[in-house]
């Protein structure tokens, strides 16, 4: 059994989590570790996560992590400390588990890693190989842990007052193909929570709420084979 600690969307407030990050084998952050995505905030985050006591740390970027989109592989390598794996449409194997991580999400204002729905974003999901145990994406798939209340749809000039599913349909199709044991995401702060669908456990690990307040707890996930148990004692 491997214990995963999952967090997302800390938006530069990771320092306030000292003492609140539980022990585990793997610490995962699924993006938006900064607020404005500048070099200083990004470097501070990687220093912080590199100091965490978990044996393995895996990170993907999110739409707020602007600087990460244009860094070369060499620049990323110089920023990411030992013991931390940064995934960008790429994978790794840790503790016998196969991971794949991608920062892209359907176009959302003028942020980083935007891809239009349809063929442009689908080509990223097509990169995900079969046999992945744990899929990490910044944004959720459509219809699962993706409800956004008071969602403003600028394309038609309407503000929705009921929860609206804003996740990616193409990602959901990819997940149906891949059938990972676990999918961890963030991005939609209001959709913090978990669900199980078609044998996959889905986690939205957003720590911040819509007001960027640290209100949610990290997820503790025990994974063994195709089984995932959520430890809710934290």
Where are these regions (language model features)?
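Extreme N-terminal starter segment of soluble prokaryotic enzymes
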Residues: 1-4
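Short beta->alpha connector loops
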Residues: 7-13, 40, 63, 105, ...
